[in-house]
């Protein structure tokens, strides 16, 4: 996992001084999971659906690079809107804040930054940062204690 400055700057108001995030996976929007998995030529692991974005999720681990979470819409939600506007491709990030999801949500509440929380998701408990366009890019913060994060 790497820390990406652009992701870091998106959530600076949600982190304590000196806090940072680690990219768990790049969100990749697609209308056909099987086709994209075949094109990548790497194994893909089925993960629980992402209820925040309305999508089925497959995780592709790339040697020496960030993992990619391939998402295909299962509802007429945010991911479907992303695909309608921008087509297939990168659509955001799943990140882990070093001080945990609860701390991030508390700071968001205190500063008026909207978040939508899910108790389960592809990487465990998570929250979608609101305020940007519904079509993305999407930023989902996952809890540091989630058992599936070491991917």
Indicate residue ranges for each PLM-predicted region.
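Vicinal oxygen chelate
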Residues: 1-21, 25, 47-51, 56-72, ...
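A short, acidic/glycine-rich surface segment
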Residues: 8-10, 77-81
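Short glycine-enriched loop/turn motifs at secondary-structure junctions
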Residues: 19-22, 84-90
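Amphipathic alpha-helical segments
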Residues: 29-46, 101-111
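Short Gly/Pro-enriched loop/turn and capping motifs at secondary-structure junctions
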Residues: 75-77, 99-101
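Beta-strand-rich interaction surfaces with strong enrichment in secreted/lumenal proteins
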Residues: 81-83, 117
């Amino acid at each position: 996992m790497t820390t990406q400055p652009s992701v870091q700057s998106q959530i600076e108001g949600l982190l304590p001084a000196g806090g940072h995030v680690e990219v768990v996976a790049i969100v990749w929007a697609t209308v056909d999971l099987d086709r994209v998995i075949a094109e990548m030529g790497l194994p893909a692991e089925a993960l629980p659906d992402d209820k925040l974005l309305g999508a089925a999720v497959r995780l592709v681990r790339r040697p020496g690079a960030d993992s990619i979470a391939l998402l295909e819409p299962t509802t007429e939600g945010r991911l479907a809107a992303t695909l309608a506007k921008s087509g297939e491709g990168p659509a955001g990030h799943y990140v882990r804040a070093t001080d945990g999801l609860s701390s991030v949500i508390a700071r968001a509440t205190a500063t008026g930054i909207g978040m939508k929380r899910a108790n389960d998701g592809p990487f465990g408990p998570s929250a979608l940062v609101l305020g940007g366009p519904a079509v993305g890019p999407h930023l989902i913060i996952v809890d540091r204690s989630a058992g599936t994060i070491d991917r």
